């Protein structure tokens, strides 16, 4: 998946060199909104010896708003919330149920858009602040997740259906981690968990 993300970013830069469309860039809207269905696929890592944290994939709707400073440079605010089941896979066999947690990760990306006829690829990078809420503790006494600041990379493409509506394919990689305190009933275990989700979305957008 990460190789696919890098290939799309490379393709976007190729478009910028070989396929800039002056006519397209003369007609742009200051605001865009997209509605996507996204797949959020965590790539979990932790600092626990003898066990690995497993975080489930989530499929949810997502809404974003984009404002263009000029024909190429824009800023995008991404809004979505996801629920993930959390397990602890113990080396040698066995799994501990750590319940579930909801993530609210508003993300702000600075984007650069290219133009190639009806195709408009783009790349972006920005910041993310993830809020953890709605925690279910599963088999342990308590789970406490610390809200965290992270970073994001993005690549995607819009395809114009007409002057107002367009289709969108978007891939984002978020780099985020959280400190978790796990109360087992016999003591509190501090754990640093890397979540680092890959997010793939497909949807429709509107210019206004």
Locate each region found by the language model:
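Outer-membrane beta-barrel translocator domains and adjoining extracellular loop/strand segments
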Residues: 44-51, 86-95, 133-142, 179-187
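Hydrophobic alpha-helical segments of small multi-pass membrane proteins
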Residues: 106-108, 125-129, 146-157, 171-173
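Long, hydrophobic/aromatic N-terminal blocks
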Residues: 36-64
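Outer-membrane beta-barrel biogenesis signature
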Residues: 5, 17-39, 43-46, 112
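Gram-negative (and chloroplast) outer-membrane scaffold detector with strong preference
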Residues: 32-41, 64-137, 159, 195-208
